[in-house]
């Protein structure tokens, strides 16, 4: 099995849009619903290699808030937006507010990152 497995999206009324990433060989419900921080970081590392972009939703289940990470000309663009996420998207993982903040801080230190206005304000906090 390929280490980075994007799981197909599933719609659940109770949870809203459910899309998860897992690097685990054995995929079970816990892996799908609660990816580890290392899974998220591993996925981010793969963005310029295997994927053009990655969406990370955060905060409460069903929340439309997310981080959009895109690799472009050897730079990363981190955006915060609230579009309708279609079911055709499979590169989405839900993370906690803290992990979202960690991504902003740590990823910005390690890479050339272009931030939108929302994340510039978040970085100041």
Name every feature range the model reports, one short phrase each.
Residues 2-35, 41-125:
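Acidic, proline/glycine-rich low-complexity IDRs
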């Amino acid at each position: 099995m390929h280490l980075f497995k994007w799981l197909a999206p599933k719609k659940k009324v109770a949870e809203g849009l459910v899309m998860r990433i897992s690097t685990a060989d054995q995929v079970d419900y816990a892996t799908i619903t609660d990816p580890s921080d290392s899974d998220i970081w591993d996925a981010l590392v793969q963005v310029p290699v295997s994927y053009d972009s990655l969406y990370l939703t955060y905060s409460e289940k069903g929340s439309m808030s997310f981080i959009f990470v895109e690799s472009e000309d050897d730079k990363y663009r981190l955006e915060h937006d609230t579009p309708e996420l279609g079911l055709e998207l499979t590169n989405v993982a839900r993370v906690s507010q803290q992990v979202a903040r960690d991504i902003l801080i740590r990823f910005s230190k390690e890479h050339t990152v272009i931030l939108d206005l929302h994340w510039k304000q978040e970085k100041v906090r």
